[in-house]
């Protein structure tokens, strides 16, 4: 098990979606249906660090636009909790197309977390 800098009781099957839009949240919810016990927590940009520290997600999902706000901080945040940082272009994308692209990455991340 990894050492942790943040107080946490157990590894979780949480995915934190930062900033939406709604289609991205829907895509993450549907992609997570293949992962037993997975649940989605959403947050806005200003409380992303708090939510990640609270839940220790195996994946952090956001749009490329949100990521562009502070790439170095998001990379560090994901690294601190050993989470996948999944970024996607949401401009013109459908929830279905984002779900299909996201599903394999989430499955790989959850398997890596619990190896």
Annotated model-derived regions:
Residues 63-64:
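Active-site residues of response regulator receiver
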Residues 1-14, 19-30, 94-115:
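Non-catalytic signal-transmission and effector/linker regions of two-component phosphorelay proteins
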């Amino acid at each position: 098990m990894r050492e942790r800098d943040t107080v946490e009781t157990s590894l979780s099957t949480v995915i934190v979606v930062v900033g939406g839009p709604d289609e991205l949240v829907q895509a993450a919810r549907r992609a997570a249906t293949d992962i037993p016990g997975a649940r989605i927590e959403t947050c806005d940009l200003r409380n992303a660090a708090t939510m990640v520290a609270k839940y220790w997600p195996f994946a952090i999902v956001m749009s490329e636009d949100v990521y562009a706000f502070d790439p170095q901080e998001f990379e560090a945040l994901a690294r601190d909790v050993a989470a996948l940082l999944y970024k996607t272009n949401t401009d013109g994308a459908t929830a279905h197309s984002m779900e299909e692209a996201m599903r394999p990455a989430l499955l790989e991340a959850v398997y890596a977390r619990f190896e």
